[in-house]
Amino acid sequence: MTNLPSIFVPLVGLVFPAMAMASLFLYLQKNKIF
């Protein structure tokens, strides 16, 4: 259980920005700003 934060923290650090970028991309695609 001691190694859980060392794995979980970088995972959240990568997944959270990726989800933010994906949601922004879908938002722009839906509104046809491109």
Curated annotation (Swiss-Prot):
Membrane topology: Single-pass membrane protein
GO biological processes: photosynthesis
Keyword Plastid on entry: yes
CC annotations in GO: chloroplast thylakoid membrane; photosystem I
Bilayer-spanning residue ranges: 7-27
Listed InterPro entries: PSI_PsaI, PSI_PsaI_sf
Gene: psaI
Subcellular location: Plastid, Chloroplast thylakoid membrane
Ligase found in the keyword field: no
Protein name (record): Photosystem I reaction center subunit VIII
NCBIfam families hit by this protein: PS_I_psaI
SUPFAM superfamilies referenced in this protein's UniProt entry, alphabetically: Subunit VIII of photosystem I reaction centre, PsaI (SSF81540)
Sorted UniProt keywords: Chloroplast, Membrane, Photosynthesis, Photosystem I, Plastid, Thylakoid, Transmembrane, Transmembrane helix
UniProt family annotation: Belongs to the PsaI family.
Species of provenance: Lotus japonicus (Lotus corniculatus var. japonicus)
Reported function: May help in the organization of the PsaL subunit.
Pfam families: PSI_8
